[in-house]
Amino acid sequence: MKFIEWLILKEGDASIINVQQVLQGKQPEWIQIVSRFPEMLQKEILEERPNPNQEDIQWISSWQLASKQPVAMNTTTLLQNKENLEAISRTPHDIIQEINKKWGLNVPAGKVYDPNPDRYQQYKQFQGSTAKPSVMVNGVIEFGVGRFIAALLRGDKQLIAWDIRSKK
């Protein structure tokens, strides 16, 4: 599959987000918070939270970048985090089974909330190097969970992510 086809399949495309347009008319506090981050991360935040509520504003205002660039995270380390395992449990049963088998896990199936559960099989067809960085806060993949699941399905040893620390 070609890269442009992949862009169309994605749940969103932060690369085409115009930061200034999206921020237009937003609360000054939100604009100030988002503007602290590199543009690529700003786009990811705005894709995930285009209309932030007060809880979003408080949460993201607490973020501190551990690195000015995305970093390569060891996938095995990410699998040691309970909340990342819970994210796996919210994927379709066949995806959970495939990940459990590949990684020697025993993640139980949970309720699937995903409006597009077929996307994981589509995403795994692409090389991890073509994916945007996920957003990891205190070791938990918060944004880009589909990219994380696809990396697990491919057996990727690393996932590229923004490494963020938060006190909340």
Where is each model-derived feature located?
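Short active-site loop/helix that positions an aromatic residue
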Residues: 145-160
